[in-house]
Design a protein with these regions (language model features):
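Short, low-complexity N-terminal intrinsically disordered segments enriched in polar/charged residues
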Residues: 1-37, 167-177
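A solvent-exposed, acidic/Ser-Thr-rich amphipathic alpha-helical stretch
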Residues: 11, 21, 25-92
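Short beta-strand edge/turn micro-motifs at domain boundaries
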Residues: 99-168
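A short, basic/flexible loop-to-alpha-helix module at the beginning of a structural domain
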Residues: 153-178, 330-342
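Flavin (primarily FAD) cofactor-binding/catalytic cores of flavoenzymes
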Residues: 133, 178, 201, 206-208, ...
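N-terminal Rossmann-like dinucleotide/flavin-binding domain of flavoprotein oxidoreductases
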Residues: 57-103, 222-292, 458-478
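Glycine-rich Rossmann-fold phosphate-binding loop(s) that bind the pyrophosphate
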Residues: 183-190, 208, 351-352
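Conserved N-terminal glycine-rich FAD pyrophosphate-binding loop of Rossmann-like flavoproteins
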Residues: 210-238, 377-401
Length: 595
């Protein structure tokens, strides 16, 4: 239970009580007194059915009252089952932070309030940042705990089908189509399918790989996750407490198989999604699936979720003379390990995570490696620097930490990451100085916001150093600039100074095309234009077309690391469930005023 004598608890209780009273009054004077002039409100489906952030008290006070009148929020109290209100530092500012709960006419939610003194108003504590997040829909709660299935359908009738019979029937889709078709069986596909399963929404995952988890299993031999285990749980099923801090790719792949079985997810392997079209009148898709035996199946789901990840179609740039090269050329997505290249000469083009890891793997296998840098790259040591952004996950519950992560509005997150970036640069100073002496071109992200914002804005452009940078500094791995190549020849890369970097292998660690290209390939140019830009931050200060409605009704996108997918899948699933239950119009656009 909370210590009600604690100053933080009293302050949070007082503010929430005044907030609820102010929302019920038509006059906004009382409400205005509760918000700091420099304040932020992030609403995740709770009051607006949108995922959006508003900056400044004026913008908040304009939007909040009409939304509150329609959605009728009430019951704002500090949640006694969550982390107690406390004094924290966020984005360089001291604040009182409290987790609260509330409900609306359609659901129940959680939120985070941060209070700071307003020096222009007698140091009165006011809201600096406010999160309101929808947690569940009334009458359609997740089938967990006391809501779990009883199992009577198969455990009490000795003449009827047993559990296995029913599972086979459910996954077979012999005489029905799924409500939701998920394309891709990685962490994003599994996360959204698991969420929808708990909301009783019929969902099928299709993936072209032969085995569940192959999207990780088939990646390069030495790969492990670059962030720590406590950040990377899938929904509902935590990793065992004896798992390593950094999970090997094959271990994660095998966990995906176990997860599908344990969560009873319907999953078709060796199934290619060939394309789909949307019938606006019927409000459903017509999609074509090609199975492993070559047969085709047409389905009519009401929703399609593209869960193929941030990295979609490999990007293979045009490089002068590369077609004349007599050795082996492959994209990094095709690379397995360096065993066959012992004693050989290898060129790796690209200095992101994959390029560095592949160069290190080749060198460790006995190859002679030269890396070519195409553009400046952010480098950060995997420990402790790269893990600083995940510091909150080292304490408290996963549920609380996910909510805290969700609660940070973009502008405060930027400031926080700039501060973290400065700390990382100081910790890594010797390494970074050595790289610059070796001729490596460094950057620190847009406005020095560090690696995570590089990921959120462009999906790459950084490296977590697990040893390759040290090899470059020592000269074990040669480094050259891609701009200094004149052309490739049969022997290798001929430089502008007339020398040649001879090679037997060229690995193109050149990244992936934008997700818009995959949307166009699968659904056509008209739908691609309707959806628009994917990933990166839009004017609403949110990731564009991620975890929310897009410009194309019935088409949803989910991508990101395991933590992003765990959090974002909850928001996406609630929207689909709301549509299926008539709480949200089926054809509403991403930013419609629909409360």
């Amino acid at each position: 239970m909370l210590d009600r004598t604690d100053d933080s608890s009293v302050a949070a209780d007082n503010w929430l009580g005044q907030f609820e009273e102010a929302l019920a009054k038509p006059d906004d004077g009382a409400l205005k007194a509760l918000f700091h002039p420099d304040s932020y409100w992030r609403d995740v489906l709770a009051l607006s059915w949108n995922i959006q952030t508003l900056n400044g008290a004026d913008a908040i006070l304009k939007a909040l009252p009409p939304l509150a009148r329609r959605i009728q929020p009430s019951g704002f109290v500090v949640d006694p089952d969550r982390a107690a209100p406390r004094k924290v530092m966020r984005a360089g500012t001291n604040a009182i932070e409290a987790i609260f709960k509330f409900e609306t006419k359609v659901g129940r939610g959680s939120g985070v309030i941060r209070l700071i003194p307003d020096t222009d108003d007698g140091n009165r504590l006011k809201a600096w940042s406010l999160l309101t997040e929808l947690g569940e829909l009334k009458g359609f709660e997740e089938q967990l705990g006391v809501q779990r299935p009883r199992g009577n359908a198969y455990s009490r009738d000795f003449r009827g089908p047993n559990w296995l019979d029913l599972r086979k029937e459910s996954a077979g889709y012999a005489d029905r189509d799924p409500t939701v078709l998920v394309i891709g069986g990685g962490q994003s596909g599994l996360s959204i399918a698991a969420r929808l399963k708990q909301l009783n929404v019929d969902t099928l995952i299709v993936d072209r790989e032969q085995r569940i988890g192959d999207n990780w299993r088939k990646r390069y031999h030495a790969l492990t996750l670059h962030n720590q285990v406590q950040v990377n749980h899938l929904p509902y099923m935590l990793f065992p407490p004896n798992w390593p801090t950094y999970i090997p790719k094959d271990k994660l792949a095998n966990w995906f198989e176990a997860y599908v079985e344990a969560m009873e997810l319907n999953f078709w392997t060796e199934t290619e999604f060939e394309g789909g079209s949307y019938d606006e009148k019927a409000q459903r898709w017509t999609v074509t699936l090609r199975r492993a035996d070559g047969t085709k199946r047409t389905m009519h789901p009401r929703h399609v979720v593209l869960a193929t990840g941030v990295s979609g179609i490999p990007s293979v740039p045009e490089i002068a003379g590369l077609k004349d090269f007599s050795g082996k050329v492959m994209h990094s997505s095709q690379y397995d390990d360096g065993e066959n290249w012992k004693g050989k000469r290898a060129i790796v083009i690209g200095t992101g995570n994959s390029g560095h890891d592949i160069a290190q793997d080749l060198h460790s296998s006995g190859a002679h490696v030269t890396m070519f840098q195409r553009s400046s790259t952010l480098v950060v040591s995997i420990e402790p620097s790269a893990q600083l952004v995940y510091a909150p996950y080292n304490e408290g519950t996963l549920e609380d930490n996910d909510l805290i992560a969700t609660s940070m509005p973009l502008q405060l997150a930027r400031k926080s990451h700039r501060l973290t970036g400065e700390k990382s640069k100081a910790l890594d100073k010797d390494l970074l100085d050595g790289l610059e002496r070796a001729g490596f071109k460094l950057d620190y992200g847009e406005d020095n916001t560090g690696w995570q914002f590089k990921y959120l804005t462009r999906g790459g452009g950084y490296y977590f150093n697990v040893g390759c940078s040290d090899m470059i500094v020592r000269g074990d791995i040669a480094l050259k600039q891609f701009a200094d190549i004149d052309t490739f020849t049969a022997e290798g890369a001929r430089m502008k100074d007339g020398t040649t970097v001879a090679a037997d292998l060229v690995v193109l660690a050149t990244g992936y095309k934008r997700q818009e290209e995959l949307v166009r390939k699968l659904f056509g140019e008209a739908i691609e234009k309707r959806v628009g830009t994917i990933w990166g931050f839009g004017e609403e200060q949110e990731l564009r077309n991620m975890y929310t409605r897009t410009g194309q009704p019935g088409l949803w996108l989910i991508a990101g690391g395991l933590a992003q997918c765990r959090i974002g899948s909850k928001h996406l699933a609630l929207q689909i469930k709301a549509i299926e239950e008539g709480l949200l119009p089926r054809d509403v656009g991403p930013r419609a005023d629909i409360s």
